[in-house]
């Protein structure tokens, strides 16, 4: 048992941040804190990671940042598939519900390689109000937040109380994942369009270069047209002056 490492899987989001802070405050064993950098995080997320590193230094801890050999964009546009029904195709394109290659290649496989040959217990930030994600966990996996009955809202509040704000990202997005994630809701994509124009232009360029469309129902250009129409409709719906006669 002495050789078993206790590994915190740290995404940088509210749940894994809360879990890490609580584990350290409770004096639990933490041997390694792993952050798998996809290279596609929001700028505020990288600032948050740096803030966390500064905070946990009081416990003598550091964040181990891991990266895949090839970048997200290389795999999306340049990698040649060597097997499967799309064998020989250049680039994986956008991830889909049936083929989330991005998560597998940039996170799961990277972490497994780092931990290969070690005996370890994985600590993952699954909140109490995510029971389906807690079901059927592996023998060497722990979900401390679930065990402590900490909900997602409570995890976020705990982080705020400790001074971690992500630059306001959680006021705009339910999930703070990669900024280009095709699984974002329409509301989140609307925020990206209106408040992050540089990232939106990058997203549009990536969609134009990809062999598959960003979403099944919309390309990024179609989303942009929709959001522009929404602004126009809202604008013409506002009366220019008060028509009521006093």
Where are the regions a protein language model picked out?
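Nucleotide-activated chemistry modules centered on ATP-dependent adenylation/adenylyltransferase
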Residues: 1-246
């Amino acid at each position: 048992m002495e050789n078993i490492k206790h590994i915190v899987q740290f995404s940088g989001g509210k749940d894994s941040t809360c879990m890490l802070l609580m584990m350290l405050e409770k004096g639990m064993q933490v041997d390694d804190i792993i952050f798998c950098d996809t290279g596609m995080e929001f700028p505020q997320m990288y600032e948050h990671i740096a803030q966390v590193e500064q905070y946990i230094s009081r416990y003598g801890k550091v964040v181990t940042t891991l990266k895949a050999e090839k970048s997200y964009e290389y795999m999306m546009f340049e990698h040649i598939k060597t097997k499967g029904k799309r064998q020989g195709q250049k680039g994986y394109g956008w991830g889909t519900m049936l083929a989330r290659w991005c998560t597998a290649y940039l996170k799961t496989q990277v972490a497994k390689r780092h931990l290969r040959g070690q005996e370890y217990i994985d600590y993952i930030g699954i909140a109490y109000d995510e029971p389906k994600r807690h079901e059927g966990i592996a023998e060497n996996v722990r979900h401390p937040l679930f065990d402590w009955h900490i909900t997602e809202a409570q995890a976020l509040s705990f982080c705020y109380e400790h001074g971690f704000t992500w630059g306001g990202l959680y006021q705009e997005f339910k999930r703070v994942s990669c900024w280009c994630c095709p699984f974002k809701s329409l509301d989140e994509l609307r925020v990206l369009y209106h408040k992050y124009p540089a990232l939106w232009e990058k997203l549009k360029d990536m969609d134009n270069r990809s062999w598959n469309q960003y979403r099944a129902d919309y390309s990024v250009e179609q989303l942009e047209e929709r959001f522009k129409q929404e602004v126009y409709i809202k604008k013409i719906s506002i009366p220019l002056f008060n028509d009521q006669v006093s």
